[in-house]
Regions:
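Secretory/periplasmic and organellar redox-cofactor proteins
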Residues: 1-14, 20-21, 29-38, 42-227
């Protein structure tokens, strides 16, 4: 249900571990795993809450544009005679999804820190010149590993892709919960964050449930889309 709520799950655009289909398509796999990778990458550098510098935003913005253009090109394949000039592939979908995922993570964790913590630091995770290029290298290695479809890499990636949906949605809803309950910048410890985190987690599952039910009502099936 985790993938069903956020992804079309078209078989031709998904990875398989033997007969086990990934819960997310190639593009969504890249997006959610990229977001999780970026959050974990930043998590070891303190409670920094300043957004990335302009040059990083420019690169991240180009990823979003590429994501949109490649997505449009993939959609046009369903219309005979329409194309933007290149053949869509799961590799392109995975790369563009990962690029957007890096952007989501690069914005979401600073937003979480500056909203949650009373001792957040007004510095960027990417203030050192090598921090962002290193993240790009890690993202590239992730893409190469997933696209290789080697069992030792693909199976953990499939499992983590589902987990990443919960992590990203819960983080976003926790930020919203902090704002709505007027608890921004009041916490010093994770123990003090237990209620906002619980609210965020529950809201994430409510969103997943409602979105899944809406999709079922519209399609009449729990199966992946068959276009």
């Amino acid at each position: 249900m985790l993938g069903y709520a956020v992804c079309h799950q078209i078989e031709e655009r998904s990875f398989f571990f033997h007969d086990l289909q990934s819960p997310l398509c190639a593009r969504c796999t890249g997006m959610y795993l990229g977001g999780l990778l970026t959050i974990l990458y930043q998590a070891f550098h303190g409670r920094k809450g300043k957004f990335p510098p302009t040059w990083v935003f420019v690169i991240l913005g180009s990823f979003f544009i590429w994501f949109a253009v490649d997505g449009i090109n993939s959609f046009l394949q369903f219309i005979p005679g329409f194309s933007l000039g290149w053949q869509p592939s799961n590799l392109f979908r995975l790369i563009t999804g990962t690029g957007v995922g890096l952007g989501i993570g690069a914005i979401l964790l600073p937003l979480f820190n500056l909203t949650a913590w009373s001792d957040w630091v007004n510095r960027s995770f990417f203030e050192k010149w090598f921090s962002f290029p290193l993240l790009l290298v890690l993202g590239g290695l992730m893409v190469a590993g997933v696209y290789s479809q080697q069992p030792l890499v693909l199976l953990p990636a499939i499992l983590l892709s589902g987990l990443s949906v919960v992590v990203l949605l819960s983080s976003l809803h926790t930020v919203i919960a902090l704002m709505l309950t007027r608890r921004t910048n009041r916490q010093l410890t994770w123990f003090e964050m237990r209620l906002p985190l619980l609210i965020g987690l529950n809201l994430a599952f409510v969103q997943i449930l409602l979105t899944s039910l809406l999709r079922y009502l519209l399609t009449g099936t729990w199966a992946p889309l068959d276009l």
